[in-house]
Amino acid sequence: MLSKELLAALNEQMNQEYFAAHAYMAMAAYCDKESYDGFANFYIEQAKEERFHGKKIYDYINDRGEHAILDTIKAPKVEFSSILETFKDSLAQERDVTQRFYNLSELARNDKDYATISFLNWFLDEQVEEESTFETHIDYLTRIGDDCNTLYLYEKELAARSFNEQ
């Protein structure tokens, strides 16, 4: 059985994952509007991954005999000045998520809830990958600058990204 505090925090994180998916779809919409189809695809696939994360938490809560509670998803930011801004915002969002998982892990440790600690370790590993991915994209986009040819090739690479639930 999950403690009330841990259950509330898991429900909050589940909803945060669905918000992240919503935010990534807003970024995809910006990219589509600006005719950056490859970047739009990247964010659509990123949104799928966040929905998968939300569902993973949903399933865990229910598997523990508790009730997953879906909340209202607030409207995400929809205006951006550049592709680089979307990636910087994404990195900030992922860093916030990482901190949330650290806090969840601390709650689980305090509760001596070893099953939840084990469950959360998957997310902590995932967050290392997420932050690294966005840092790499930011570095690359910064180096590209206004080089349209290189940006075009980079976008083509991102157009091939697809999320695989594993």
UniProtKB/Swiss-Prot annotation:
Any one GO cellular component localisation term in the record: cytosol
Domain Ferritin-like diiron: 2-145
GO molecular function, a single term: ferric iron binding
Catalysis: reaction(s): 4 Fe(2+) + O2 + 6 H2O = 4 iron(III) oxide-hydroxide + 12 H(+)
Binding-site residues for Fe cation 1, renumbered to this chain: E17, E50, H53
Residues the entry annotates as binding Fe cation 2: E50, E94, Q127
Signal peptide: none
E.C. number(s) listed in UniProt: 1.16.3.2
Cell compartments where the protein resides: Cytoplasm
Entry keywords, A to Z: Cytoplasm, Iron, Iron storage, Metal-binding, Oxidoreductase
Disulfide bonds: none
GO biological process: intracellular iron ion homeostasis; iron ion transport
Family under the similarity heading: Belongs to the ferritin family. Prokaryotic subfamily.
Function: Iron-storage protein.
Protein's name according to its UniProt entry: Bacterial non-heme ferritin
Species of origin: Staphylococcus epidermidis (strain ATCC 35984 / DSM 28319 / BCRC 17069 / CCUG 31568 / BM 3577 / RP62A)
